[in-house]
């Protein structure tokens, strides 16, 4: 007598209505026959059978795998999302219980469970696997933008104690995304998403050797992609691959250093840089922000004639100095005058330039001179002079009380 398969659903209630009508009693490779709306989406090489479907309000990626791994993978996705890591949104897992497998043992017939599970995730729209992007002949600048996105994902994972375990191009999705940049507005970025969480391990922190092993494994995956491309008739310059590896390693080391400094900064100030200032790609900028805050702490302590905590000084500096200056940059469109610079970068670079010039001149040069020098060295045209004066005057209005208090303090 033929065994009737049993279907068990372990899915988020949001997606339950759509998922229950799919033909789970069949292997997903055969779903086209029952009229399931299969989506034709390019993807990288996969070890398991994967289909993409549109069902009701949602599009799903469905991977056929063992129940134990499927359960763990869904839990991993949930943990990654709680940590703010760019990854897939899990819908849950669905198990088909087939007829048990009979195994003859010395003590008699034993029946092993024969369960086939399916990891179900929400489909990320308008995204390409990096293995597809990797086959294209991009200019170095654009290739670096793709690699930057991947490095940021690595730093995000490792900074949160997450060991990917199967870091590879095939398990990475790349997507153009609009994100809000503080005091600048929406900008488009390339973002990398972790798209396979089977082997993810979440720890308190990762050792240097684990992080190094993860990167080396990823470098091996680049070689595998090269071999796959070669087999399909596409040849990629080995020199370019080696250059890419060096670029990834160098960028990773810099951004991981930034990540460590940001965490220390938050411990000292109770202030999240990413949330309030935006992304920073230079480790020294974190140190400079802290220096400015410590200076502001001294200033308000002198003004109030009492000790001020670093956390209180940070909040006051942000409210009375940083925000007003960045609003000047935004309102006067100075970000357009200095293309590619964020408001936070402009703040640091102009203030740092003032410190540098004052040290060279052995006197306080003032904001106006510092701004003019910064503009001149970064190639601002003559027609921006009136705008520059207007901006400088507004910046001076913000900084005047501090200028009066310690004109030459460094």
PLM segments and residue spans:
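Low-complexity, highly charged intrinsically disordered N-terminal segments
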Residues: 2-10, 53, 64
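Activation-loop N-terminal segment of eukaryotic-like protein kinases
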Residues: 174-188
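Intrinsically disordered, low-complexity, repeat-rich regions
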Residues: 239-251, 269-273, 278-285, 290, ...
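Conserved ATP-binding subdomain of kinase catalytic cores across diverse folds
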Residues: 20-132, 136-137, 153-160, 164, ...
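Hydrophobic residue at the +6 position relative to the catalytic HRD Asp in the kinase catalytic loop
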Residues: 167, 172-174
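C-lobe/activation-segment region of protein kinase-like
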Residues: 186-266
């Amino acid at each position: 007598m033929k065994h009737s398969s049993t279907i068990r659903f372990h899915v988020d209630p949001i997606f339950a209505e759509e998922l229950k009508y799919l033909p789970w009693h069949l292997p997903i490779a055969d779903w086209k026959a029952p009229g399931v709306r299969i989506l034709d989406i390019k993807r990288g090489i996969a070890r398991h059978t994967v289909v993409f479907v549109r069902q009701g309000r949602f599009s799903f990626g469905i991977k056929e795998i063992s129940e134990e791994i499927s359960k763990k993978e869904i839990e991993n996705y949930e943990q990654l999302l709680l940590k703010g890591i760019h990854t897939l949104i899990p819908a849950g897992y669905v198990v088909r219980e087939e007829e048990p497998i009979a195994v003859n043992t010395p003590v008699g017939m034993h029946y092993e469970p024969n369960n086939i599970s399916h990891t179900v995730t929400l489909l990320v729209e308008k995204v390409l696997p990096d293995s597809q992007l990797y086959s294209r002949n991009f200019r170095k600048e654009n290739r670096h933008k793709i690699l930057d996105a991947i490095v940021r994902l690595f730093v995000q994972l490792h900074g949160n104690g997450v060991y990917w375990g199967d870091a590879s191009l095939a398990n990475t999705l790349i997507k153009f995304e609009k994100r809000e940049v503080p005091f600048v507005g929406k900008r488009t970025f390339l973002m990398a998403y972790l798209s396979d969480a089977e082997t993810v391990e979440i720890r308190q922190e990762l050792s240097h050797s684990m992080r190094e092993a993860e990167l080396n494994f990823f470098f091996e995956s680049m070689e595998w992609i090269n071999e796959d491309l070669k087999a399909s008739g596409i040849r990629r310059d080995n020199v370019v691959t080696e250059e890419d590896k060096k670029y990834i390693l160098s960028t990773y080391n810099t951004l991981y250093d930034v990540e460590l400094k940001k965490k220390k900064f938050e411990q000292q100030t109770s202030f999240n840089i990413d949330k309030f200032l935006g992304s920073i790609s230079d480790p020294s900028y974190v140190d400079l922000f802290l220096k400015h805050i410590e200076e502001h702490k001294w200033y308000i302590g002198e003004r109030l004639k009492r000790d001020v905590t670093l956390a209180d000084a940070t909040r006051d500096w942000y409210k009375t100095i940083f925000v007003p200056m960045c609003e000047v940059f935004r309102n006067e469109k100075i970000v357009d005058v200095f293309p590619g610079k964020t408001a936070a970068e402009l703040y640091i670079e102009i203030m740092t330039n003032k410190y540098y010039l004052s040290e060279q001149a052995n006197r306080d040069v003032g904001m106006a001179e510092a701004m003019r020098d910064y503009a001149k060295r970064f190639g601002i045209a003559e027609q921006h002079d009136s705008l520059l004066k207007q901006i400088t005057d507004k910046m001076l209005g913000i900084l005047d009380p501090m200028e009066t208090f310690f004109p030459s303090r460094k």
